[in-house]
């Protein structure tokens, strides 16, 4: 059975690492043929570019950023499944401004699923950018960081 490579960029370790590690550990429980590559975005991306023979890939992006459009195209062209779990977002009304809707729908076409923090964000997307649902799937999942707080 061919290995699936699961890429997990993590640049702000103090904020993101524990939550990303929980994601990795929960995946390991259910999938046996997966190899994880976790590190800074630069390190992870360099590994992908260097290893052109990898066929099955999953990339857990930290959010959708138009600066990385060419990178998303590169990953999609290689057959990589791209998922997003933003590390910034609002779960409270006062944080609503943290959610950016300045997203290129061409990028959304390349992203398999977007995991979002709250119903508040989901409802904002429905209200302001309903057309996003024509390009990608959005699921309210919360963030593993909150799971760490509850245990």
For the regions a language model picked out, list residue spans one by one.
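Active-site and donor-binding regions of nucleotide-sugar-utilizing enzymes
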Residues: 4-151
